[in-house]
């Protein structure tokens, strides 16, 4: 087993995007849009009509390996913050969290921060993938999101 004492269990990346926070948030809060900007190249598709609006909602996503994930919304502030815990269908989340935070710089620019927190991950089978989720992969998602939002 790998010693995780030197591996950060909370990683993040951030940058300014030349778009309004509300426009960027729509791309994040609508799961059907997520495969377009996923820097991990892990998301294949999500059914339309799952736009997230509050804590407690669950949206389904299919991975590129054909697995379905149910994502449980645990943080939500319209236009500013959204976070979810992925899980196998009809299972409790194993404890890793994806968070997006948007801070308007002005009406046309937004600081976007993307965080992956696996400090409470209990599923040992997921540890290798968690360790492989680096700030560079999170930055890739932000950069792809920026290309869409600024396009």
Q: Where are the predicted features?
A:
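Beta-strand/loop substructures that line and gate deep hydrophobic ligand-binding cavities in soluble
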Residues: 88-140
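Glycine-rich portal/gate segments that line the openings of hydrophobic small-molecule binding cavities
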Residues: 16, 45-91, 111, 147-151
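Hydrophobic/aromatic beta-strand elements that line small-molecule binding cavities or substrate pockets
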Residues: 13-15, 69-75, 96-104
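A short, structured loop/turn motif at beta-sheet edges
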Residues: 21-22, 74-79, 101-111
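Hydrophobic ligand-binding cavity/cleft-lining segments
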Residues: 1-50
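Residue-level preference for beta-strand/loop junctions
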Residues: 7-9, 65, 94, 108
